[in-house]
Structures are given as structure tokens and as C-alpha cells.
Swiss-Prot record:
Keyword Signal in annotation: yes
Residues on Extracellular side: 30-304
GO MF annotations, alphabetized: ATP binding; carbohydrate binding; protein serine kinase activity; protein serine/threonine kinase activity
Cellular compartment(s): Cell membrane
Taxonomy of the source species: Eukaryota, Viridiplantae, Streptophyta, Embryophyta, Tracheophyta
UniProt protein name: L-type lectin-domain containing receptor kinase S.1
Cytoplasmic side: 326-656
Disulfides per UniProt: none
Biological process (GO), any one: defense response to bacterium
PROSITE patterns recorded: LECTIN_LEGUME_BETA, PROTEIN_KINASE_ATP, PROTEIN_KINASE_DOM, PROTEIN_KINASE_ST
Keyword Amino-acid biosynthesis among record annotations: no
Domain of life per record: Eukaryota
Region (Legume-lectin like): 30-273
Amino acid sequence: MSWQWRRRQWPSPLLLILIVLHLVSSSSAIDFLYNSFSSVTNRTDVILIEDSRVESTVISLINDSDPLSFGRVFYPQKLTIIPDPTRNPTRLSSFSTSFVFSILPDISTSPGFGLCFVLSNSTSPPNAISSQYFGLFTNATVRFNAPLLAVEFDTGRNSEVNDIDDNHVGIDLNNIESTTSVTAGYYDSVNGSFVRFNMRNGNNVRAWIDFDGPNFQINVSVAPVGVLRPRRPTLTFRDPVIANYVSADMYAGFSASKTNWNEARRILAWSLSDTGALREINTTNLPVFFLENSSSSLSTGAIAGIVIGCVVFVALIGFGGYLIWKKLMREEEEEEIEEWELEFWPHRFSYEELAAATEVFSNDRLLGSGGFGKVYRGILSNNSEIAVKCVNHDSKQGLREFMAEISSMGRLQHKNLVQMRGWCRRKNELMLVYDYMPNGSLNQWIFDNPKEPMPWRRRRQVINDVAEGLNYLHHGWDQVVIHRDIKSSNILLDSEMRGRLGDFGLAKLYEHGGAPNTTRVVGTLGYLAPELASASAPTEASDVYSFGVVVLEVVSGRRPIEYAEEEDMVLVDWVRDLYGGGRVVDAADERVRSECETMEEVELLLKLGLACCHPDPAKRPNMREIVSLLLGSPQEDLLTGLTPAAAAADSTAAHA
């Protein structure tokens, strides 16, 4: 009898296990709703990093007063993504989240940036370039397994990472280049049609993300606030590879970055749950940062009277207003050309001419965008093709100085430079007009497994072309032109696949025998000469260094920096080490090695690239010597000092 009584008092072992599991599960569960951020505090309710901050009821990710800004915000408690990482590392758990965001640029035609929802095992992801790539990633397009996964809401098009357009949603697996992406829009729940919309007009946008761990699937839906959640997701990604980019516990949050262009990015509300159904966001009273809807207490009759009165008023003054408007437009056009502009290179296009050529700067004509601005393809009335680059300057003085240099460069004439045809100014926006290069940029033919790899003879020719163009800039014109941003993406290919050096937005001019008056470091990581890190002024030698990196890129088929989980690969150091070991031809692209009957020319160019990248700028060849060597003239003195032993010493000096 007593045994039976005790049995009734104690639960079974199975029940105890279930209770413990339930308690553990409950203690780690996350289920929250922020319909406003007015009362949140840093580190307690959310983790605010860098420039992210609470502004009234919303979280602002970016500081518009800082030209290079980034911000992140995370929920302080980590999500459990892999419940049992030791015994079953590929069994993932699930969660759902929904949030409302707003993206509003200062200038509608400026480059866009966007924001990301992110899962990361760290609030400071390693190797992230803070002011670019959403403040999360590097500029490498080679993926490596690490716990970082993002859903990007991208409002800029970067052709270097194969963005599909400047208004899309994508899945990023520890890489700025999306694994999959789709134009922003939603599927109508009634007729099933796909409705596109603009994420970059300041209007509130609602996003829903379902992370289905057991099925390795991510569903993303996005729609303007006011649209019910679509039945069909905007984007679905299903692949077991997801398991490679998550860890046992991960922070959930948002990240964004910017360069010189202002684009406010705000999180207005956020809900997340890993226990089941989401708590619903109330979007009724959320702030609106563009075209605010104003409520009215006026009666229908009063509103009708106001409308009728307005119609009568417009009818009375319409014709006169039209005449005044036409007069003001003519005066504005006349005032648009200021006296100081007449000093400069005179080929000035009208805005109407460029608008017609680009279909009013249509997204369908967009070639690319970046920190410099947007580039559009255009067709003039004479059927000639052009590329129009839109650049914004905040001050008239800065615009005038920029115009002075651009006008000088407009007089540059060489077959291996992208020819500038003219310009147009509209207020503080400058539009530069160039010849259109139909075959894109060199990097598109070298990296990322292009459909038609560039054969060796064309690679060799492009190196020659760029060398001759750069030699002209350094030695062949009235002034010395320092390009300062030589890289494979700034080398464009014409209809005959001949290389032309383009993008002179960072270039500086000075007299022969003089020196540039700037020490500001600009350019692209991986191409910058080491002496620039010590505030040295850019010179012909720093351009030669960048050219040497391009030579090594073209011959090896590898990027200047390839980021990896354990150690980054710096191209110059890698080739120098191979040369120091007597194996420099091993650096050549496999496609090149299989094509060439002899490796002598390949070895010569690799050695030339190393000579151009010498750590000591005084020991680098100049462009005259380089062109002479490439054209076949004996220049043994350029390379005689470049022995394997010397390469090893250079490598030591470079890392000192």
C-alpha cells in the first residue's frame, strides 16, 4: 500500500526528462516585439554599435553628418540555431522575424546602399570594411565558411559583385555577392501577379523572414506597409549549405553603411520569435518620413468646398501661371551657365539632351554605381553611344575645383584612354559624358569564371594598352597626371577588346618636375602602394605599383586580396614568395598555362609585375621603361636585380 502511495507521488523518469527539456527550452526562448524604440536602452534591450542610435521612437543606423559611417544593432540575447552542435551540427532550429524599415536618400539620383538583416556569432564580424558592404563584409567574392548570414535589402547596384539592379532583396552567405537575389516586390494574394515597388522613397516597408532550419530554407517576403502579408514569398532559398554559415548561437540584428552620399536608414518596429507565431506589429501609428499622410477633421462638405475652390482658382490663374513658369524656366536655363564655367573645356551638353539619351536616367540604362555616383548608358540623337556618370558636389567651390581638373582631363587624347566627350551641370550635380565601352571592364573577363575566359594573347594586349595609356598620362602630356585608382575594374574594353584606362575621378595634375599638393590617401585596398600608408604624396611610382598589381592579376587570374578564414592571401606577397622559391610560373592562371607553348613571356610579365610592386618606390621602373620592355626592347636592367634572393629580401622588407 505504501509503495503504491509513493508511486503516485513521484513522476516517471520520462516525465521528469520532458519537464527539464521544457524548462531548458523555455529559458532560452526568444519572443519579443518592439512597436516603438522610445524606451529601449543600450545593452539591456538592444546592442547599439558605432553610429546606430535611438532617435525618438525609431533606430537610425547611419550618421548622415559622417561621410564614412556604419551602424549595427543586435538583440542582446543570442538565438539558438544549432541545439546540439557536437552530436548533430547540421540539425538547425527555426525562427521567424518581421520588421518595418524606411530608406530615404537626400538626392534621388545618388548611389544607394540599403541595409541588412543579419545573423552573426559576433557583434563585430571579422574583416568587415566598416563604411562599405553594409558594414559586414569584405570586397572579396570568394566565399569561405564562417558564421555570418544576411538578408540584404539593397538599394544600390554594384556591377563588381553582380548585383541584378539597384532595388533588390538577396541572401548573402558571408559574402557581399548574393547567393540569390530578386527585384524588390511582392506577389499579389488575389491574382498572383508580381508587383514591384521602390524601397528607396522613404515609405515604410514591411519585411517577413522565416528561417526553417530543419529544411535548410529561408523565405523572405517584402511589401509596402498597408499590404497584407503575401501568401507567396518574394524570395525562397533552400540549400543545406546554409549549415556552413551558422553557429550554435548567433546574434540577430541589422547593419548598414555609407560613403559620401546620405541615405537615412531607420528601423521602426521589430518582432522576433523562435517559439512559434510572431507577435503582430501595429503599423498604424508608425512615423512616416516621406509624403506623410495627414489626418483631417473637416467634414466631407468642407473638403468638397475646398476642392472646388482650388479648381476655380487654378482655372483662373492657370494660363498666366503657365506663362510665368515658362519664363522662369528660360531664366533658370540662362543662369545655369555661370561665368566661371566659361573658363573650362567648352563642350557642354544640355540636361535635356542627356535625359533623352538615357531615357530620363532610367534604371534600365544603369550600368553601375558606387561611391562615385551612378553611370548610365545613353544613345545620342546621332545614334552614337555614350556613358553618363552622375557626380554630386555639396559646395560650389568644390564643384569649381573639380571642374577645373576634369576640364583639363577632357583635353587628354590617347587611344588607350576612355575619351571624355563633355559634361553637363545641373545645380550641384555634374554629369560627365564618356565614350561607351561595349565590352565592360577587365575584371569581368578575368575573375568569377566568365562564360568566355580571356585568352592569353588578349591579356597580353590589354597589359600593353594600359601601359601605353599610363605612359601618356605620366610623360606624354603637358602636365603629369596621377591616376590614383588604377585597378582592373577601371580598365574598360572597347568593341575590339582593346584596353582603355578610365575613371579619372581621383586623378591629380601637376607640372613636370613638380609634386602633387595632396597627401590624402585614396584608392582601392590591394592596389595602394605601401608608401601611401605613411602619408606620402601620390606619385608616378604609386601609379606604377597599382599597374604592377593589375599585371599580376591578369597573369594569375587572382584578385589583389583574397580573404580566407585562416589567413588572407595578398597577391603581391604570394607571387613574390613563389618567385623567391624559384616557382614564379606556378602563379600563372591555369587557363594561361594550358594555352601557352612556352612560359617565357608569362614569366617575364610576372617578374615585371613584381618589379613594379617593389616596396621601395625609387626602385620601381617608370612607365617609359615598362612600355619599352613590353614592346620588345631590351631592358634587362629592370629585372636583373630581381633575383629569387632579392625577392625574398623584398618580401621581408614588405612585412617589416
